[in-house]
Amino acid sequence: MNEFLPFSRPAMGPEELAAVSEVLQSGWITTGPKNQALEQAFCALTGNQHSIAVSSATAGMHVALMALGIQAGDEVITPSLTWVSTLNMIVLLGAEPVMIDVDHDTLMVTPQAIEAAITPRTKAIIPVHYAGAPVDIDAIRAVADRHGIPVIEDAAHAAGTYYKGSHVGNRGTAIFSFHAIKNMTCAEGGLIVTDDEQLANRMRSLKFHGLGVDAFDRQTLGRAPQAEVISPGYKYNLADINAAIALVQLKKLEKNNARRTEIAERYLTELANTPFLPLSQPAWAHKHAWHLFIVRVDEATCGISRNGLMDDLKAKGIGTGLHFRAAHTQKYYRERYPALVLPNTEWNSDRICSIPLFPTMTDDDVTRVIAALRDVAGY
């Protein structure tokens, strides 16, 4: 019997082990020089002036919203088809998430849908770069600029994603994730990029108790030995153990994403005559990072439901994922917004299925997934 093939697996090697060993032997295992190196290296990738490493992308979203002053009575525009942490952070700050529909085939928000949702209470817009493809950020920024509303790009899926020749996040404020299934990972972690120095300073303080400096700053940069609280903050700093892993993963990102692209191209070609519908590619110039490969499973054309397909593949020893169940259909948000209807989001949320895609997949692994899907479809 074949070994179980998960939908995702982190691509780790001896370089990551050596990086962790170096930190463990250094005597400085929490936030320190590896964090600084990671922040500098990521700025070099995206072209931003500032970056702040954090313990998760969720933590990054929290401090970004706080740094913008989001509070009770404010509205924040976001798709419902996103990971629930974004909605949760908005609600926990006392603000209202304004959930909008997505394009039927790219699953990304459109500037038109954003424009229609703006009110005098709108204080932020959070578009999602979905599955490794970029949203039309120029058009979205144009809408936001006309109304004087800040944009926070959810780039959790977008390490290595390029839009019109520039890395996602360039010239803006964006949040990346280093969670275990992401294109680059350090188990748990995240990073915010921005060109707004005042915003960067505020987020850096908020992620570490609201202090002006962290322990490494005090020890190595000759600053005041006692830190001072500027405003109440959180404990969202990233340990150097994690940052060291992320640095190695960043060096491997281009190569790993190239392998992801090879796998995705095989899926696109060899599943083209099956009823499993892939997402459409954006019309604007871009470089896809292929964080996810998603098929839509419509029972009317596939002869099986999405959940049925997931069960069938599991029985064949193949893992799958769901990215995402629409937030407004989940208990808390359904009860809070019972009248909200988002047709494209709901249609896709019932049908999307993420199939295995990770850089250490072998060609035989890819063949196995394709064969299983073709078998289910009767091809």
Curated annotation (Swiss-Prot):
Pfam families: DegT_DnrJ_EryC1. One of its GO terms (cellular component) is membrane. One of its GO terms (molecular function) is UDP-4-amino-4-deoxy-L-arabinose aminotransferase. It is an enzyme of class 2 (transferase). It catalyses: UDP-4-amino-4-deoxy-beta-L-arabinose + 2-oxoglutarate = UDP-beta-L-threo-pentopyranos-4-ulose + L-glutamate. It comes from the Bacteria. Its cofactor is pyridoxal 5'-phosphate. Keywords: Aminotransferase, Antibiotic resistance, Lipid A biosynthesis, Lipid biosynthesis, Lipid metabolism, Lipopolysaccharide biosynthesis, Pyridoxal phosphate, Transferase. Gene3D superfamilies: Aspartate Aminotransferase, domain 1, Type I PLP-dependent aspartate aminotransferase-like (Major domain). The keyword Lipid metabolism applies. Homodimer. Belongs to the DegT/DnrJ/EryC1 family. ArnB subfamily. This is UDP-4-amino-4-deoxy-L-arabinose--oxoglutarate aminotransferase.
